[in-house]
Amino acid sequence: MSDNVQQQVDSVGSVTEKLQKTNISRPRKYIPPFARDKPSAGAAPAVGDDESVSSRGSSRSQTPSEFSSNYGGRREYNRGGHYGGGEGRQNNYRGGREGGYSNGGGYRNNRGFGQWRDGQHVIGARNTLLERQLFGAVADGTKVSTGINFEKYDDIPVEVSGGDIEPVNEFTSPPLNSHLLQNIKLSGYTQPTPVQKNSIPIVTSGRDLMACAQTGSGKTAGFLFPILSLAFDKGPAAVPVDQDAGMGYRPRKAYPTTLILAPTRELVCQIHEESRKFCYRSWVRPCAVYGGADIRAQIRQIDQGCDLLSATPGRLVDLIDRGRISLANIKFLVLDEADRMLDMGFEPQIRHIVEGADMTSVEERQTLMFSATFPRDIQLLARDFLKDYVFLSVGRVGSTSENITQKVVHVEDSEKRSYLLDILHTLPPEGLTLIFVETKRMADTLTDYLLNSNFPATSIHGDRTQRERERALELFRSGRTSIMVATAVASRGLDIPNVTHVINYDLPTDIDDYVHRIGRTGRAGNTGQAVAFFNRNNKGIAKELIELLQEANQECPSFLIAMARESSFGGNGRGGRYSGRGGRGGNAYGARDFRRPTNSSSGYSSGPSYSGYGGFESRTPHHGNTYNSGSAQSWW
């Protein structure tokens, strides 16, 4: 045995001696195959060198620019960027605190982002592919355009109370940042809507705002424009130093400066897409978090930078509890569709976010509330969240736009399918049609019926997965599927261009829901048509529906008037609901600033009497849209 071992040792020694004589040695660095034939001066550096592309385990410390926006965190992340440390640059955001930021280069520029460097806003390079994705090509039908009735917005009555601030009549610098104006122009905006004319100077002057405006009037841009303009001018805020950063493992935490809360996933995604347009080539990085999607993917997204965050309340609370998001740096808080969030039971989550988490105090931030309706309980809630705010009411809250031609027809439940097909056969091929039903089962059943009848249709409701809902919206927006059957999930806030027809297959029990449903058409000054199937099952909203039609100067069919009289016989039906919630009539807080006493039932303290959102003192009612079964073209 010892002889065999000695022979093996001798053989190994001889091989080693031969290798030394032939000058063959193990390479000290790994050289990739594609670089082995190149001169040594041009060889790719080995993995592990300072110049190399880092491996997965060290990528965060090697690419500080990837995580340069609004982050504090563990010490090992501070090697490339000054996160939460004393070496950060001086900035002038709300007092010019030091530290917290180091905006690197390549990553953001490659993705259409700029950077904040040495107190200056450095605009990123243009990205033509990203521009086409964000803003579309010329005459792109998937992008909303200004309608032919856009100029009529100037006739809409506007009430502003709580401040003497002059409105702006066009997009100019000042008050808006010059780079933001370029993105506004790329987006196709030519003139501000009434809500934008007033919200821009109010927010840029530093005031809180409660804004009531008709659906489709540009509320989203109404808060994005002034917020982003201030952000572009003042730069990022310093990240607070995490006192526990060095005590064991702690997850990386995002510190956004703007938080936008919305009730539904679809609305959050829509706000996020609008934010991407106006943040293009700037230092501001927008992110979105919402339920129904992979939270790990959303965490990876905010790990790459999060300055402007759009979120649903439930998912945001989850991420706050996980320690992934801090609200200690919030300068702007936006509550969009606030009444809807309370209707959906989000008040505990909203109060936890605003009052229970580490949110900045009401004195340290600007708070904005935007919605189409603001009932009394919402205005009372505003006292806890807003300070010395300006109340803005554009048009009569709870009404509909005269840009929408409304028609109510009497259809029994058993005849609805046949009646629907009659309508769809008369519609032009261009344009999109949105059909609202009350139940998820009916949405799927009606979609199958339309597909079997050779109509391209899809559906969206709460039982569909987030991926299915996003896919359905994509097909509908692009026009590949021109008909969408939806439940209430699509009735609020969604801005889908080119929706020319809305059909209420099932009428809702709440007149506000009807307002939001038909508001999916006739947006941004464009015209639209809305038809409602009405029968005895809907008599509870007959009276309010008549008021709505009269305010918008629409035709009221005789059967609807008779049904309203029948439902109100011996009582006031459901009309009493509005005396407490704030819709039409009485001292409806939804139409005026509840801080101001008034003797007027309209909610406006002065000025002439206006009719609905049309804003005209007198107007001849619409005629000629009575249905005639002998002529399909007489629908509109």
Swiss-Prot record:
GO molecular function: ATP binding; ATP hydrolysis activity; mRNA binding; RNA helicase activity; translation initiation factor activity
Domain (Helicase C-terminal) ranges: 403-564
Taxonomy, superkingdom: Eukaryota
Entry's EC annotation: 3.6.4.13
One Pfam family of this chain: DEAD
The keyword Nucleotide-binding belongs to this UniProt entry's keyword annotation: yes
Modification Phosphoserine occurs at: S52, S54, S55, S58, S59
UniProt GO cellular component terms: cytoplasm; cytosol; nucleus; spliceosomal complex
Something else known: A different form of ded1 has been identified via SDS-PAGE studies. It is uncertain how this form arises in vivo.
Family of this protein: Belongs to the DEAD box helicase family. DDX3/DED1 subfamily.
Protein name as it appears in the record: ATP-dependent RNA helicase ded1
Organism in which the protein naturally occurs: Schizosaccharomyces pombe (strain 972 / ATCC 24843)
Gene that encodes the chain: ded1
